[in-house]
Amino acid sequence: MKLESIQFKHIALFHDLKIQFQYDKQPITLILGEQATGKSMLLKHIYHALTWFPARLKDARTPGIVMPDQDISHSRLQSKIEVSIQIPPEFGQLPETASTQQTDTSLCSWKLFKTLNSSGVGISQVETQQLDQTITLYHQVTRKDPLQGLPLLAYYPSERFVNDINLLNKNLPGITQSISAYDISFIPFTTFARFFEWLREISDIENAQAAHVVQRIISKQSNSQDQEEILRQLQLELAGHPKQLPSPNLYALKSTLKIIFPELEDFYLQYHPKLQLMAHYKGEVLAFQQLSNTTKTWIALVGDVVRRLCLLNPLSLDPCLEGEGVLLIDQIDSQLDAAHCSEILNRLHRAFPRLQIIVTGSREELLEHAAVYQCFKLEHGKISPLDLSTTQQQLEHLYTLLQRDEALTPHIDPLPLDPEPATTQIDSLYQQIQNLNEQQKNELLRMIHAGDTSEETSSL
């Protein structure tokens, strides 16, 4: 699933705004804008409109997130969102009908309306016929092909932080089910609680599986003291399988974190002497709580995306490389330094190459690799493509002028600094000034103010 286009009418600041995405050419969409231009509002409503897909995937009668009444533009009685997504070829196409105006059967569209009645109460209406047909295609394909995964839909608002690391809960119902990868509810902020619960669960499961392999090899040995033979058998056992197989979820998590944070060498759950989350970061082994708030938040965000992809692609050896879907991150440059800000989008694309990544931000460092992005400028309730070629030409022209001016400027050797006057000379000058009478002192002050230092020297 890829987002093809979305249109807003009379929603908050957006009276008539449409975005046409180009995932095939530019898989990353960057929406830049100053503060209070509506970036968060835009991304929030994109997510709200897309939640109807996982909601109907869960149950044909389940609604997605409904537009709040207060988001209807002032002095307007109705607002509308129209969404269009691209259906992957492996899922087929929508059936053609004589009444439909859509010619491309690989696209699925649905509309969401909110109308205020005479009492000022909003009434929601939806047109989801094509969405329901698409969900039927997904159910048919996934039943026939268990290896086929489901698309990701993840949204991370600007208010995101690690509040509590809950590692004590075990055996939570439904935590490893695919449907738990979707959040079909309004999300004003996120604390990544589900990621830490999932991390404890898969660590227990995959550590137990690894221990079972070792125990099976030990049981085959007649002499339990032959440690070298046990180690050799263990190496042979693991050599016959892909390296992801013993712990596919943990492998996906660690390898993805390594791509986005090269300075993070390891990330694991320590059971003894006490249960805690550990990180090997910049050559030091630290408790997770000892990392900076920004580092903790980004590790949790990336880990949560990995969690969702692992749940939606349970039989994939590389869920992060094979998983598809839409990833939405608001204010991606928040709390990042300049170095990470310029590289974060490129690294996210390397870690999740088949995800459609849509982000908002305000800093120019995000444009470091903008040649491969789809960039928009949001201002005054309208969105327009960012002309990167013109900006690049202007920068190159300025750079050329600076180089030419530097070549024409004659080289001037810096003058040597005057040696610091000796202390005895200063004391002698001070003593001479003290020996002057009041009239001479006043004359000296007048000449100093007038800048006539030559006369001052001769009089002394």
Task: Please describe what each predicted stretch is.
Residues 1-214, 371, 375, 380, ...:
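P-loop NTPase switch/coupling surface
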Residues 1-61, 266, 271-406:
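Switch/communication elements of ASCE P-loop NTPase nucleotide-binding domains
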Residues 35-36, 74, 145, 242, ...:
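Aromatic-acidic/polar surface patches that form glycan- and anion
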Residues 24, 184-322, 413, 426-427, ...:
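Extended helical coiled-coil dimerization/tether regions that scaffold
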Residues 149, 246-254, 395, 405:
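A structural signal for well-ordered alpha-helical scaffolds and beta->alpha junctions
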Residues 68-72, 222-224, 228, 350-351, ...:
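An exposure/low-complexity boundary signal
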